Amino acid sequence: MIRFTLIALLALAGCTGKPDNIKPVTDFRPNEYLGTWYEIARIDHRFEKGLSQVTAEYSLRADGGIKVVNRGFDSKSGQWKQSIGKARFVEGKDKGYLKVSFFGPFYGAYIVFELDEPGYQYALVSGPDTSYFWLLSRTPIMDPALRERLLDTAVANGFKRED
């Protein structure tokens, strides 16, 4: 678990910028974004390599930030891995632009650039550049046609498809 957290930290350390063509959603409603999200697709990175059944749980912190609990199953070890972090808003709570830290003062960008309205049932998320991408859903299984449409949107925005 410590290795999972440290690799995530190192991969995102100091990377709070955003890709030029990616714009955070506006009129973001943090309280509606809270709760459990299921990872439907991603661009693989060392901190998630080999993990399946990945979830992200977001809850409100007393300081106004967001608690982040990422969890995934490592089939190689046969164990669940979990990493706990915190997120803060970069440009105000009404924009889907946050910075996330899993260790100390090191933050990485978390940019929600497409979000289901009004229900917040899916989200497209970028990191500091287009090598970081996640498709998240409120349910562990997504309608295949919707999944394809969202992945096409990601590709049109410069993300590489890995499935």
Q: Predicted segments — roles?
A:
Residues 1-8:
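Sec-dependent signal peptide recognition
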Residues 15-163:
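A beta-rich soluble binding module of mature secreted/lumenal proteins
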